[in-house]
Amino acid sequence: MKNLQQRGHLLTEQVNPNSHNLDQLSSLELVDLFNQEDKQTLKAIASSRLQLAQAVDMTTKALSQGGKLFYVGAGTSGRLGVLDAAECPPTFCTSPELVQGIIAGGANALLRSSEDLEDSWEDGNEAIASHNITNLDVIVGITAGGTTPYVHGALEGAKQRAAKTIFITCVPVEQFSIKVDVDIRLLVGPELLSGSTRLKAGTVTKMALNILSTGVMVRLGKVYGNRMIDVAIKNSKLRDRALRIIEDLTELSRDEAEELLNKSGDSVKLALLMHWSNLKKEEGDRVLSEYQGNLRAAMKNVSFSTE
């Protein structure tokens, strides 16, 4: 690793020539400048499309074989990983263990700045050991500037356990190189406020994590068309969404959809299979289990298919 005390060469630390007069702009000019600069995030995602697709495929394979997905980061990068992981259970009805976020400083760092904790390579390495990482798992190291010791300690620990590794950063390989399975470079350029990587770097990182986690869940069969058929029904909003999905896909009335959802044990996926195949709940559960929860695959192998 390069000398961590000298980071001025990194793209994320450089001065943005478009914002040299940032403190003299009107509020509207500030908004317009942010809007203009944020367009770089879309370009960065487009430039990394092949690597992102590779990450989706590799992670899908790992999770389908019993592995887990771990995001590791410090500061903003760590919080974004925790955020994405926390959204998977309600969106895709996954267990909290399937996708996890590991942040330097633990839960306290989610609420209070803990920048000093990112400098410990050993803490990152120990975090991997404490989570019992195996060769079935995928570790995503997230560091906007590329050099965070905590993240590199975690990645090294992952490699020692033969886990798959993904690196997400906002600096080019010429400025910082690393050996991982998938290397994703989201080059959004210098920040409007020099060095404040919670801005464009944070935005583009969230976009990449959105693509990774959602892409994996789509590939695992937790989506039918563009419908959230594995939604965990935990409140009235999500129950309404579940009922609307059933209504839209089956043309049942609201009351009929409610009855079907109740019979399925509040599983949209199972409710749809029961309706389309005339299977009872127990048999539907068995069929879905046989096809690893993939509704479309199950429907191709039962009678009364809608295909």
From Swiss-Prot:
Active site per database record: E87 (proton donor), E118
Annotated EC: 4.2.1.126
Superkingdom classification of source: Bacteria
Pathway(s) it belongs to: Amino-sugar metabolism; N-acetylmuramate degradation
Stretches assigned to the SIS domain: 59-222
Pfam family, one: GKRP_SIS_N
Residue intervals passing through the bilayer: none
Keyword set includes Lyase: yes
Keywords: Carbohydrate metabolism, Lyase
Any one GO biological process: N-acetylmuramic acid catabolic process
Catalysed reaction equations from the record: N-acetyl-D-muramate 6-phosphate + H2O = N-acetyl-D-glucosamine 6-phosphate + (R)-lactate
Quaternary structure and interacting proteins, as annotated: Homodimer.
Extra remark: A lyase-type mechanism (elimination/hydration) is suggested for the cleavage of the lactyl ether bond of MurNAc 6-phosphate, with the formation of an alpha,beta-unsaturated aldehyde intermediate with (E)-stereochemistry, followed by the syn addition of water to give product.
Protein's name according to its UniProt entry: N-acetylmuramic acid 6-phosphate etherase
Species: Trichodesmium erythraeum (strain IMS101)
This protein's encoding gene: murQ
